[in-house]
From Swiss-Prot:
First-level EC class: hydrolase
Tagged with keyword Cell cycle: no
Organism: Vibrio vulnificus (strain YJ016)
Cofactor annotation: Mg(2+); Mn(2+)
GO process annotations (BP): nucleotide metabolic process; thiamine metabolic process
Short name of one Pfam family: NTPase_I-T
Function noted in UniProt: Phosphatase that hydrolyzes non-canonical purine nucleotides such as XTP and ITP to their respective diphosphate derivatives. Probably excludes non-canonical purines from DNA/RNA precursor pool, thus preventing their incorporation into DNA/RNA and avoiding chromosomal lesions.
Binding of Mg(2+), residues: 75
Binding site for substrate: 75-76
Protein name listed in UniProt: Inosine/xanthosine triphosphatase
MF term (GO), any: ITPase activity
Family, similarity comment: Belongs to the YjjX NTPase family.
Length: 183
């Protein structure tokens, strides 16, 4: 079956973060090179802590973002929730993509955080705030993220999210192998 999407499809992104929006745009245009998309970011709550501190809380945040984006904007063909979190000494993100009939999910690669960053997290709002403090950056979470700092810009938040989003799109790029899983 072809991966082509013919008409303009609205992709509702449950974030206004430029790094997340860039990753979603990149993944969709890569997965569907003949597709035409309109990408719309919306500010919706994750209903979890600003800095989720477990895999399950992070996953729930991504699911909640999709649910809340659907409630906010009923006109989407796709809804994308991305939630970054920490579990132990690693950070990662969950990607959830839904249409009206399908859901795809994937977790990004994980990266270890320095001990001095981990030590400061209990008194911080989000990892990005601690990274800015420790590394002397400003608003890193909306740029390359912790991963760009720790890999000397070999990877960025958007590049790692791009890969995870491509994986979350598998049910949509291979619909003949994935029956509808939403009712």
């Amino acid at each position: 079956m072809s991966k082509k999407i013919m008409a303009t499809q609205k992709v509702i992104i449950a974030s206004l973060n430029p790094a997340k929006i860039t990753a979603v745009e990149s993944a969709f245009t890569s997965a569907f090179p003949d597709g035409t998309f309109e990408f719309v970011g919306v500010n919706v709550p994750s209903e979890v802590a600003d800095q989720p501190m477990s895999d399950s809380e992070t996953h729930l945040g991504a699911l909640n973002r999709v649910r809340n984006a659907k409630a906010c904007r009923a006109d989407g063909a796709f809804y994308v929730g991305l939630e970054a979190g920490i579990d132990g000494n690693v950070t990662f993100a969950w990607m959830v993509i839904e249409s009206h009939t399908h859901r795809g999910e994937s977790r990004s690669a994980s990266l270890m955080l320095p001990p001095n960053v981990i030590a400061k997290l209990p008194n911080a709002n989000e990892l990005g705030d601690v990274m800015d403090e420790v590394f002397g950056t400003e608003n890193i979470k909306q740029k390359g993220g912790a991963i760009s700092l720790l890999t000397q810009n070999q990877l960025t938040r958007s590049s790692v999210y791009h890969q995870a989003l491509i994986l979350a799109l598998i049910p949509f790029t291979n619909p003949e192998h994935f029956p509808a899983n939403l009712s």
